[in-house]
Amino acid sequence: MSLSALETTLNTAFDARDSITAATKGEVRDAVELALDLLDKGEARVAEPQADGAWKINQWLKKAVLISFRLNDMAPIPGGPGGAQWWDKVPSKLENYSEQKFREAGFRAVPGAIVRRSAFIAKNVVLMPSFVNLGAYVDEATMIDTWSTVGSCAQIGKHVHISGGVGIGGVLEPLQAGPVIIEDNCFIGARSEVAEGVIVRKGAVLSMGVFIGASTRIIDRATGEVYIGEVPAYSVVVPGSMPGKPLPDGSPGPSLYCAVIVKRVDEKTRSKTSINELLRE
C-alpha cells in the first residue's frame, strides 16, 4: 500500500472510529498495523523537518495511533520486577528482541528503560532507565537520561542530551496540536519540562529546571524580544521571572515565571564550549 493510499484509509477510518472495536478486521486493521510498523522502524514519522526549517505534521499517523487503542484489547504484558506483569493495550517495542536484533538496531537500553511499540530509536542512542512513549522519534547518538520521559509523538534530534528527570510532553489529542520538537545538538537540563508543542531549535541549551509550555514567555534579556512557543537556535536559556501587575491596592503584584535567554552562541562556539561554561555568568 502506498503512503497516500495508507493516509486516505486511515483518515476515513478515523472519521468512522466509533464503529471500530477489537473485533474489527480487514483493511482498517491492516492499515493501522502498517502505519505503526513504519513509525516503529523510523520509515515514517509524525513530524518531518523541511528544507526551510519548518516542520510538516502528519496528522494521519497520529490518527493511526489513536485508532490502535480501539483495535487492541487489554492484555498482560510481561517483564515486571519479580515476574510481575503490566496490563495495557500497547506492547513493548523491545518485546522479543534477540541479541542479534539489538546489535542490528545499534542502541543501548539499560535495565529499567521502557519503550512502547511504534516509537523509533536510532543507532547509538543510549536509553537510561527512562520512558519513551508511542509514536516518538529519537534520532542518532542521543542520550535519554535517568527518569526522563519522551512523550507520545515527540521528536528528538541527533546528538541531543535529555538530562535526568526531564519531561518532554506528548501529544495525541487534540489532533491539530503539534508535537514537542527538540532539534539537533540541544541540551535539556535536569528536571526541565518542555511541553504543548514547543519547538527547541538547533543547538539550544536549557539549564536545569526550565519549564516551557505553549504560553511561556521566553525573553531575550539583551534585546527585550519575546518568543512564545519556540526557543531560538543556539540560545542559552535559564529560569527567570518578570514583574506582575500591581495588586488592587497598588502594592507590587506577584512576579510571573518566564524563561530568559541569557546569551546566544554560534555553532562553532557551541561545539567547543562545555555546558557549564555556557551557563556560567
Swiss-Prot record:
Main location (coarse class): cytoplasm
Gene3D superfamilies per the record? Hexapeptide repeat proteins (2.160.10.10), Tetrahydrodipicolinate-N-succinyltransferase, N-terminal domain (1.10.166.10)
- Where is the protein situated, by its record's location annotation? Cytoplasm
Record-listed E.C. numbers: 2.3.1.117
- By its UniProt entry, which SUPFAM superfamilies does this protein fall under? Trimeric LpxA-like enzymes
Query: Gene Ontology terms, cellular component aspect?
Result: cytoplasm
Q: Name one GO biological process term.
A: lysine biosynthetic process via diaminopimelate
Reaction(s) catalysed by this chain's protein: (S)-2,3,4,5-tetrahydrodipicolinate + succinyl-CoA + H2O = (S)-2-succinylamino-6-oxoheptanedioate + CoA
Kindly give the InterPro entries that the UniProt entry links to this protein. Answer: DapD_Trfase_Hexpep_rpt_fam (IPR005664), Hexapep (IPR001451), THP_succinylTrfase_dom1 (IPR023180), THP_succinylTrfase_N_sf (IPR037133), Trimer_LpxA-like_sf (IPR011004)
A molecular function (GO) held by this record is:
2,3,4,5-tetrahydropyridine-2,6-dicarboxylate N-succinyltransferase activity
Q: In which pathway does it act?
A: Amino-acid biosynthesis; L-lysine biosynthesis via DAP pathway; LL-2,6-diaminopimelate from (S)-tetrahydrodipicolinate (succinylase route): step 1/3
CDD domains membership: LbH_THP_succinylT
Q: Which named protein is this?
A: 2,3,4,5-tetrahydropyridine-2,6-dicarboxylate N-succinyltransferase
Name of the encoding gene: dapD
